[in-house]
Amino acid sequence: MNILGRLGGALLGGSFAVFGYGAVRDPAALAKLAGPALEEIRKVVPLPKDDELLVRVNGAVQTGAGAALAIGLFPRTSALALAGSLIPTTYAGHPFWTIEDPAQRKAQRTQFLKNAAMLGGLLVVAGAGRKGAASGTGISAG
C-alpha cells in the first residue's frame, strides 16, 4: 500500500477505533439512543434484548477492525467489518427522518451523510485489489 493509502487507513481506522472504544467503555447513552431502532430491527432479526450488550459488541468490532485498518493489517477484511457495523450504527444513531426540529434534523442529516461518506471510503478500501490481483475497481491497495 502506498503512503496515501496508509495515511487514509490510519485516519479512517483510527476514528473507528476511538469511537468504538468509547462505546465499549460507556454504552449507556448510545444504547438509549439506539433503542428505538433496535426494537424495529428485532421485528425481523432475532437480536438479544440487552441493548448495552449490542452497543458493546458493535463497539468492539469497530475498535478491533478500526485498529487493524489503522495499522494496515488485513485492510480489506477490516474495512468490510467496519462497513457492516457502520450501517446499523448510522441507522440507529442518526434517524434524521424522525426529527421534527429543523435544526436538529439538519444536524442529524449531516451526521448521517458523513457516515455514508465514511462507508464509501470503506467500500473503496474493501474493493481495492491486492497488488497484481484483478478486482475490477481499477484501484490497487498495493
Residue ranges of predicted features:
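Short amphipathic, positively biased membrane-proximal segments
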Residues: 1-142
